[in-house]
Amino acid sequence: MTKKKAFTPLLYLVSIVFLPWWLSLSFNKSLESWVNNWWNAGQSEIFLNDIQEKSILEKFIELEELLVLDELIEEYSETHLQKFRIGIQKEAIQLINIYNEGRIHTILHFSTNIICFVILSGFSILGNEELVILNSWTQKFLYNLSDTVKAFSILLLTDLCIGFHSPHGWELMVGSVYKDLGFVHNDQIISGLVSTFPVILDTIFKYWIFRYLNRVSPSLVVIYHSMND
């Protein structure tokens, strides 16, 4: 009975870790054909935001300039003009296909993330007892660590998250999440998140040290500041 009681929270922990990945993969595979059919069968007007429109226009202008340059290099004849028009049409169709694939990717990932969020929320509510047990195990594990190990772990974590070299890591992580959610890549928004989010985390962390650690373990705070200096 005790082994079963201890095994259940571990099984729940493994499910929490691997369930999002499995759900995302499963729903992507199952919804992909349906979203493709729905998008291709739809006759709705295409809406482009400023970023998408600018990106497509830049690609098309770049393509047109390359083809014009190619025509200037070759002999000027009716055959070459015909090839030029055909090349423009083919590349225009390719750009439209790229746009359609991007929109399908956005719809697919947005729908998948909503479904996964709902399922994980229900999973967390139903597994409240297991969460309590896991929380007690975590607290017991942290309590048994020495203050030096705790201070070192806190210092390592903060340096990784809000240290001098952390912006590049944040940029990769935010960009990955941004892409996974199905949004169009935007350097300005990503740069804004990278420049503000670590600052907010740093403020919250300092407040946590001031309010919680000073009261619970003053020696840990002293060791942390000594190692940080």
Swiss-Prot record:
A cellular component annotation (GO) from this entry: chloroplast inner membrane
UniProt xrefs under InterPro entries: CemA
Lineage: superkingdom: Eukaryota
GO biological process: potassium ion transport
Keywords: Antiport, Chloroplast, Hydrogen ion transport, Ion transport, Membrane, Plastid, Plastid inner membrane, Potassium, Potassium transport, Transmembrane, Transmembrane helix, Transport
GO MF terms held by the record: antiporter activity; proton transmembrane transporter activity
Places the protein is found: Plastid, Chloroplast inner membrane
Catalytic activity line of the entry: K(+)(in) + H(+)(out) = K(+)(out) + H(+)(in)
Topology in membrane: Multi-pass membrane protein
Pfam family name, one: CemA
Transmembrane segments: 7-27, 114-134, 154-174, 189-209
Summary of the function given for this chain in its UniProt record: Contributes to K(+)/H(+) antiport activity by supporting proton efflux to control proton extrusion and homeostasis in chloroplasts in a light-dependent manner to modulate photosynthesis. Prevents excessive induction of non-photochemical quenching (NPQ) under continuous-light conditions. Indirectly promotes efficient inorganic carbon uptake into chloroplasts.
UniProt-listed HAMAP family: CemA_PxcA (MF_01308)
Family of the protein in this entry: Belongs to the CemA family.
Record's protein name: Potassium/proton antiporter CemA
Record organism: Coffea arabica
Protein's gene: cemA
